[in-house]
């Protein structure tokens, strides 16, 4: 781990300054791109925190070259294939945690209300996901961690899906005990999602009901049990560029199989409901920077890409991304699966179940 937890909490976080207002990078654009080409493209070694920060500080005029390099890295170390995933909310709303970006928290005055999905509906959702060509289906629950009732529902749902649908089943159920990790592994859960969300130094500004270290501990248990680990980020929650670089290298140190990149889609009633969207060019720079930090990892487009990038999302596919969620998210709308599959076909990027080459 590369940074210590801060003791002060900022009441009103602000977005990073636009590129035109930022201090110059420690290295000029040509230098860091040369370093990245040698170390990452040729050597397969991710950039360190200083290198990632230099990339995030690059001016707009270098963006085309940066994205091209990140795409080269993705093609060399991951290949042209794209992993497609669908997600479904087994248990929506009423979460006791206070993640400031999330409308499913029971602590905020958001329009999301608690609801459960039954097992036949889970199987139907998995079947619809598989029909798109997707190879991954993730069952998500808005909880701190699963209780006995939820684990029983997941056990039944995973068994029913595996019996009826040819698709990998993943889960995202919050923080786990070692016994729950072992139980999910025994069920045949393919991959477990638990995001770090933001840099360790910024985490107290985003969540106060649990610690960054608790999240890290669950991730380490998942890896130790032999399940694939999906662990990512949400960008635009008031973090600085320095903290984005910190997060990228903390994720790299964890060595997840997959890193989903979310961009804040401000939700009414949440503490971050009035934060600005990440600027599209900054989002693309971040995608490239995370690819250059983790050249061999599955890097997935996740929530917020539509509202953040719009039609520029194709640039992310040509700038380091090699996986995506299709269809809707947990409480927000995504692009149609048909539109995303058409984009992949036009880019000649075949759909395939992926493994990180760590």
UniProtKB/Swiss-Prot annotation:
Listed PANTHER family: BIOTIN SYNTHASE, BIOTIN SYNTHASE, MITOCHONDRIAL
HAMAP family linked: BioB (MF_01694)
UniProt cofactor(s): [4Fe-4S] cluster; [2Fe-2S] cluster
Protein's UniProt name: Biotin synthase 1
Biased composition (Polar residues): 1-11
Claim: Iron is one of the keywords in the record: yes
Xref: Gene3D superfamilies: Aldolase class I (3.20.20.70)
Pfam families in the record: BATS, Radical_SAM
Function description: Catalyzes the conversion of dethiobiotin (DTB) to biotin by the insertion of a sulfur atom into dethiobiotin via a radical-based mechanism.
GO MF: 2 iron, 2 sulfur cluster binding; 4 iron, 4 sulfur cluster binding; biotin synthase activity; iron ion binding
Enzyme type, top EC level: transferase
Family affiliation: Belongs to the radical SAM superfamily. Biotin synthase family.
Keywords: 2Fe-2S, 4Fe-4S, Biotin biosynthesis, Iron, Iron-sulfur, Metal-binding, S-adenosyl-L-methionine, Transferase
InterPro entries attached to this UniProt entry: Aldolase_TIM, BATS_dom, Biotin_synth/BioAB, Biotin_synthase, Elp3/MiaA/NifB-like_rSAM, rSAM
Cofactor binding note from Swiss-Prot or TrEMBL: Binds 1 [4Fe-4S] cluster. The cluster is coordinated with 3 cysteines and an exchangeable S-adenosyl-L-methionine. Binds 1 [2Fe-2S] cluster. The cluster is coordinated with 3 cysteines and 1 arginine.
Pathway(s) the chain acts in: Cofactor biosynthesis; biotin biosynthesis; biotin from 7,8-diaminononanoate: step 2/2
Catalytic activity, EC: 2.8.1.6
Catalytic activity: (4R,5S)-dethiobiotin + (sulfur carrier)-SH + 2 reduced [2Fe-2S]-[ferredoxin] + 2 S-adenosyl-L-methionine = (sulfur carrier)-H + biotin + 2 5'-deoxyadenosine + 2 L-methionine + 2 oxidized [2Fe-2S]-[ferredoxin]
SUPFAM superfamilies given in the database record: Radical SAM enzymes
Subunit structure: Homodimer.
Annotated residues for binding of [4Fe-4S] cluster: 95, 99, 102
Any one GO biological process: biotin biosynthetic process
């Amino acid at each position: 781990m590369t940074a210590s937890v801060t003791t002060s909490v900022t009441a009103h976080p602000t977005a990073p300054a636009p590129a035109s207002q930022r201090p110059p990078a420690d290295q000029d654009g040509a230098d860091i791109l040369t370093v990245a080409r040698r170390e990452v493209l040729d050597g397969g070694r991710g950039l360190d925190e200083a290198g990632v920060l230099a990339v995030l500080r690059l001016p707009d005029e270098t963006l085309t070259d940066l994205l091209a390099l990140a795409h080269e890295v993705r093609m060399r170390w991951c290949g042209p294939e794209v992993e497609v995933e669908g997600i479904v909310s087994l248990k929506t709303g009423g979460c006791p945690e206070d993640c400031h970006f999330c409308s499913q928290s029971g602590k905020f005055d958001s329009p999301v209300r608690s609801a459960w999905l039954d097992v036949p509906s889970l199987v139907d959702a998995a079947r619809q996901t598989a029909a798109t060509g997707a190879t991954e289906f993730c069952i998500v629950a808005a909880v701190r961690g699963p209780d006995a009732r939820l684990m029983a529902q997941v056990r039944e749902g995973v068994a029913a899906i595996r019996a009826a649908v040819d698709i990998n089943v993943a889960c995202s159920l919050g923080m786990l005990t070692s016994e729950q990790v072992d139980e999910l592994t025994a069920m045949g859960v393919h991959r477990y999602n638990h995001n770090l969300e933001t840099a360790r130094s910024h985490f107290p500004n985003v969540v106060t009901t649990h610690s960054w270290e608790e999240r890290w501990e669950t991730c380490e248990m998942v890896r130790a049990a032999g399940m694939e680990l999906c662990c990512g980020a949400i960008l635009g929650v008031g973090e600085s560029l320095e903290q984005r670089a910190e997060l990228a290298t903390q994720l790299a140190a964890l060595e997840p199989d997959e890193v989903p990149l979310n961009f804040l889609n401000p939700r009414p009633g949440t503490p971050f409901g009035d934060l600005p969207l990440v600027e599209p060019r900054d989002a693309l720079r971040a995608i490239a920077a995370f690819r250059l930090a983790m050249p061999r990892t599955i890097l997935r487009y996740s929530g917020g890409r539509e509202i953040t990038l719009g039609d520029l999302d194709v640039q992310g596919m040509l700038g380091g991304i090699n996986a995506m969620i299709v269809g809707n998210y947990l409480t927000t709308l995504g692009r149609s699966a048909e539109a995303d599959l058409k984009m992949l076909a036009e880019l000649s990027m075949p759909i395939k179940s992926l493994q990180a080459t760590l």
